[in-house]
Amino acid sequence: MNLCSSGATASTTSLSSTGQAERSGGVPGGGAEGGGGDGGSGNSGGGGSKTNDGSTEAPTLCFAGGSGTAGAIVGSAELSNANSPANGAGGASGSTGSGQQPTGSNGHSHLHNENNANMPPETRPKMVTVKHPESNKPKPTTKKSKPIQADQDVIKALQRCRDEGIKRLDLSKSSITVIPSTVKECVHLTELYLYSNKIGQLPPEIGCLVSLRNLALNENSLTSLPESLQNCSQLKVLDLRHNKLAEIPPVIYRLRSLTTLYLRFNRITAVADDLRQLVNLTMLSLRENKIRELGSAIGALVNLTTLDVSHNHLEHLPEDIGNCVNLSALDLQHNELLDIPDSIGNLKSLVRLGMRYNRLSSVPATLKNCKSMDEFNVEGNGITQLPDGMLASLSGLTTITLSRNQFASYPTGGPAQFTNVYSINLEHNRIDKIPYGIFSRAKGLTKLNMKENMLTALPLDIGTWVNMVELNLATNALQKLPDDIMNLQNLEILILSNNMLKKIPNTIGNLRRLRILDLEENRIEVLPHEIGLLHELQRLILQTNQITMLPRSIGHLGNLTHLSVSENNLQFLPEEIGSLESLENLYINQNPGLEKLPFELALCQNLKYLNIDKCPLSTIPPEIQAGGPSLVLQWLKMHSPYRQM
């Protein structure tokens, strides 16, 4: 029996008023996940569109399915009009109906039947104008104001698709559970969007859509695909993300025109050797499955530019990966990889290589050949050192992330390895020294993260890091901050928490662009008066030190929004704290010697949070303290000798 036989007449193949056959090819759109990320399914336009030869293409049919990438028009707005752009009017807008009778941009009002006018409002059908290709006459049609709720509505949609020769059909986000067999009659379809429904299986008749090029089935409950899908020999994009597939359906391996295949977030445990048949693939996403082995078949996919196998259980990669010489993005992060094959060096077009969070103890020296890479990230492995001079060979690198490994020293290769780098992250290693002159060629270096290492001192040439914007030296064993810190006048973020600093140099006042200064958990007793010169400072964190008083110059920090001096030895707060007009959060809790607050604190009108826990404030009644910042400030104001405040 021929599943694809139907009563459709040949007239459905042409919708041009001149009798000219309509052009092949669907409306552009329908992109999905890109580079392993979550993408959408393209714009869903409405209405017909003009072709290059002046004839009219078949319109797109889009049902309202809520907001999202398809973006159908909801309510009583127009579905299309004569002045629609090429990809259809109203697809991306997602606008809702206003409740008024709309008028199309071509001047035609929506038509109402006289009988409808006499019907009660609650039973009167909503009317929308659909521009039919063979005529400029508006055609009334019924449109629900809510997403499709019942599967019988799909039957009507498919009938209309058949009758009007629709090429692009969007039934996404419509709570559909079953696709009826009448889908076989929609022979003009080139794009079909069924994502975000409740579909458990596809009918065999789906194979009748032999013109289909883009099929989006993501976010359903599919466990298999019908064998008849192999008849869709022109299919180029297949999106099966977020389903319940335990294996790659065998029929997929026979879709040899596929260029893009998304299988992310399923339950796939293995990849068959038949994968080698998909030689036209340029993008393959197997992200977030349960795959333990990637066979040699991957090497046959020589046209691949993007391969995402992240978040699986891979322990090894086949040497054949080196045959995929057109790869520009290879994502291997969050696996259990123990090694990387030497053949990786054949991938000379590689720009991005994700190796984060694996079980690597080393990387191959052949990576030197991948000179197009702009980012090198091996965070969360067990690497102790990189191949000698490898980073220097990768002269295009701008970002280097070596955090959460076992480095005891900086990578070998000298200053040349950081020439074009603007961000270096070596957090959570065992490095005890930053080599003198290591950044002498790094003129563009703006971010350095050395948090959670074993540094006891900073290099004498720290003053040459003049372009540094963000410097994180937290959780080390630093005992002194060099005076030359004053030369880092582009610095905006300085984090020195959890060290052994006893004082801050007066030259700190030269860092006029500083926005965040974190000195938490040190041994600081006194802050320099020059702290008041940091007029751009927004966050000052001083908690868990041994500070006995704040300098009066703190009143000059007009942009300060967050001040934490909890767990210190404060005896009082300076009156100048009342000048902090931008202050929103003030932590002064656990200062056992702080017995009173200055009345001037009431001038901090923007204060939203005040923590005074475990401070013996004998002058303020407990019930006032328990009432929160506003009540405390009100009490201070009422009892102030300056009633005019």
From Swiss-Prot:
Residue windows of the LRR repeats: 165-186, 188-209, 211-232, 234-255, 257-278, 280-301, 303-324, 326-347, 349-371, 372-393, 396-417, 420-441, 444-465, 467-488, 490-511, 513-534, 536-557, 559-580, 582-604, 606-627
Comp. bias intervals (Low complexity): 1-19, 98-107
Annotated region (Disordered), positions in chain: 1-67, 83-151
Annotated Gly residues bias: 26-49, 88-97
SUPFAM superfamilies on file: L domain-like
KW Repeat (keyword) present: yes
Alphabetic keyword roster: Leucine-rich repeat, Repeat
InterPro entries, per the entry: Leu-rich_rpt, Leu-rich_rpt_typical-subtyp, LRR-SigEffector_domain, LRR_dom_sf, LRR_R13L4/SHOC2-like
Pfam families: LRR_1, LRR_14, LRR_8
Function: Acts as a Ras effector and participates in MAPK pathway activation. Probably acts as a regulatory subunit of protein phosphatase that specifically dephosphorylates Raf kinase and stimulate Raf activity at specialized signaling complexes upon Ras activation.
Family: Belongs to the SHOC2 family.
Name of the protein: Leucine-rich repeat protein soc-2 homolog
Species the sequence originates in: Drosophila yakuba
Gene behind this protein: Sur-8
